[in-house]
Amino acid sequence: MVVTAIRQTSSDRLIVTLDEAEEIKTTLGVVTEHRLYNGAELDDAAAEALRRDSARALARDRALGMVSRRMYSRKELRDKLVQKGEDADTAAYCADWLAEHGFINDETYAAAIVRHYAAKNLGVSRIRMELSRRGISRELWEYALAEMPENDSALERYLRQHLPDPFDLAAVRKVSAALYRRGYSWDDIRTAVEQYSKQYEDF
């Protein structure tokens, strides 16, 4: 195959034409790395490497734009890239490259998720669900959850905000159900309500 044209479309984007037929969208970095020029001859392996490296470079730039706007886990990033039309191998390459260069970090992301949902007074089981949904590996869960504030203080805070009368049984049932949906165990909820009620009795 012969490079019959190299056309620049933006500061870092080019289109390389092979045999006056196949157009490959690529980047300046790839063109430089492959030392392409008009008239350059490529064997099948070199042409395939050009296609692969071009797809990876464009997908990598797309991924960098994505992680500049919000945090992603490796799995989230892979899945999102596939949704946007990248093939699975290219998406996996991008996630690995970004992780290797420090642009994504599942451990840091897990800790951020725990802090975010703990601040919303969510319990451990609900936070575990959020970690799982985002594709965070289980081995990172416990490390991140170890940084979570104690349940007691979060539960007490929630009860103060939502249960003005701890002796109103209907209100207690409603608040208890809400806390269970937030990921707290029934044992933790019952203990917290009892302690909260005792404060009123002592008063």
Which residues make up each language-model segment?
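An alpha-helical, amphipathic repeat domain used for nucleic-acid recognition
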Residues: 1-203
